Amino acid sequence: MKVTFLDSPEMIDRHWPAVESLLGPSVAELARGEFNVDDLLTMVRCNRAFAGLVESEAGPVLALVFEFRYYPRCVALHVLALAGKRLSEAAMTFWPVLQCLAQEFGATRIEAHAGRAMSRILSGAGFKHQYDFLKFEINQEV
């Protein structure tokens, strides 16, 4: 399997359709209106987020968009979107590469907001449930 990070405008143009095809359905279902794949593309083009793609001989198998979050006492690679096919097989190749990249950028952890199914998958990769993420929608009438 081959890991590619979309780190130039040419790489984005060449590989984004594959990233979009893998992420599109899960982003539409799980992002709950916070962002869509077009927003992710804009973030990647502006260097606000980064995209990665894992491909096998048969084609794309895993896509990821992430950003770095700078907390007062640590840096985290924050997964915005992750989807694919044959995830456990792809993760064997991708996971060590992602960890090295995170360390190169000064991150000491990788974090993700994930639905239940992805949480189960990520738990198998060593992720631990840290806390529950809550939201409160502010309406316009205050």
Predicted regions and their residues:
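Active-site/acyl-donor-binding loops of N-acyltransferases
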Residues: 112-116, 120-142
